[in-house]
Structures are given as structure tokens and as C-alpha cells.
């Protein structure tokens, strides 16, 4: 229900205001613009992950969603549903798409950052949503709205963050972008 959504947003507004105030203070700005959300808050801290490490991080993160979910994510990795690396002429960004009679496919530009790992988790959430919709519903009901689509993708992202917080030294996690970076 829309009233529940609005109530939930209102309930969490103080947290958002606190985050904005903190980010403004750290960045030394009076007004926070959209691009400021992506500005790093620390200097000289970075981590690099291989694609194999990224796949394992995503698989570990989505484990709470059950064996079937994990098996299909593994299948997606094994069957190369993902066009992973940047190439000349390849567009930027990341997308998940496909048709009712095909597997979902992901286009991304993995660079080894934690943000790239988070992007794979996010896009795999879209792909899993599509896979389950297409395998459990007739074609006329298998599509979904953008609002609904973002639920599955952000759940995967949040599971990744929760997994990192549980597995890593919390002092080592720094929020340098919308996603945490670990200093392994």
C-alpha cells in the first residue's frame, strides 16, 4: 500500500538527514549536490577484487536467499550470463535484460572495485527476479514495474553489505561511496 511506503520513508527521514549532514561536514560543503554522494570520504584507501573473488562474494552474500537461488546465481556465472569487462565501443553503466524465452543477461563494466562487486550483486538481483518471473508465470504476467524491479536488486546489494559487515573487521569498512569498500 502506498500509505505504508510513505510512512516508512517518513520514519527513516531522520537517518537520511543525519547522513546528509555528516557528508556535508566531512566534505566541507554547505549544500550537498547529487554528485557529492559519490565523492570519496577518505584518501588512499582502496581495495581490488578479481572477478572470481567478486562472484564468490556475491554467492556468499545471497546464501540467505536459499539453495535454489544460489544454484541459479551459480548457473548464471557458469553459463556466462554476464558481459563483464569494459571493451572498446561498449556502453557504460550496467543493465540486466532478456526476453521471456531466454536467460536474463547482464551488461556491466567490472573494474575490480567494491562498487563493481556491488553492481554485479545489484544486476544479478534484477536477473534473478526476471528468471523466477519467467519460470513461474505465463508471459503476460512475467513483466514488472521499475519500482518492483529495484526491490530484488537492492536486496542483493544490502545482503552484500551485511555479508561484508559480518565477515570483515568493521574498523576496516569505510563508506567511501554509496557502497562500502573494505581495506583487505
Please report, for each region that a protein language model flagged, where it lies by residue.
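Contiguous, non-catalytic segments that form substrate-binding/exosite surfaces or channel walls
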Residues: 3-105
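Single conserved hydrophobic/aromatic residue that forms the stacking wall/gate
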Residues: 1-2, 175-183
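Catalytic glutamate of the conserved HExxH
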Residues: 119, 123, 127
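A sensor for short, sequence-defined functional sites
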Residues: 65-69, 135, 172
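Post-HEXXH active-site segment of zinc metalloproteases
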Residues: 130-151
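Short pre-active-site segment immediately N-terminal to the catalytic Zn-binding motif
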Residues: 107-120
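Post-HExxH zinc-binding segment in Zn-dependent metallohydrolases
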Residues: 144-171
Amino acid at each position: 500500500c502506498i500509505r505504508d511506503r510513505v510512512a516508512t520513508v517518513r520514519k527513516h527521514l531522520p537517518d537520511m538527514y543525519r547522513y546528509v549532514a555528516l557528508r556535508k561536514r566531512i566534505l566541507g560543503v554547505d549544500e550537498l549536490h547529487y554528485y557529492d554522494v559519490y565523492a570519496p570520504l577518505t584518501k588512499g584507501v582502496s581495495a581490488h577484487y578479481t572477478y572470481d573473488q567478486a562472484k564468490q562474494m556475491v554467492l556468499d552474500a545471497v546464501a540467505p536467499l536459499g539453495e535454489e537461488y544460489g544454484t541459479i546465481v551459480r548457473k548464471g556465472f557458469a553459463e556466462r550470463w554476464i558481459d563483464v569487462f569494459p571493451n572498446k565501443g561498449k556502453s557504460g553503466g550496467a543493465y540486466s535484460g532478456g526476453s521471456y524465452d531466454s536467460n536474463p543477461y547482464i551488461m556491466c563494466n567490472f573494474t575490480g572495485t567494491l562498487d563493481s562487486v556491488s553492481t554485479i550483486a545489484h544486476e544479478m538481483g534484477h536477473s534473478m527476479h526476471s528468471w523466477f518471473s519467467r519460470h513461474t508465470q505465463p508471459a503476460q504476467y512475467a513483466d514488472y514495474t521499475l519500482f518492483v524491479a529495484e526491490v530484488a536488486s537492492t536486496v542483493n546489494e544490502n545482503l552484500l553489505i551485511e555479508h561484508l559487515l559480518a565477515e570483515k573487521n568493521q574498523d576496516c569498512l569505510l563508506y567511501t561511496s554509496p557502497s562500502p569498500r573494505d581495506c583487505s
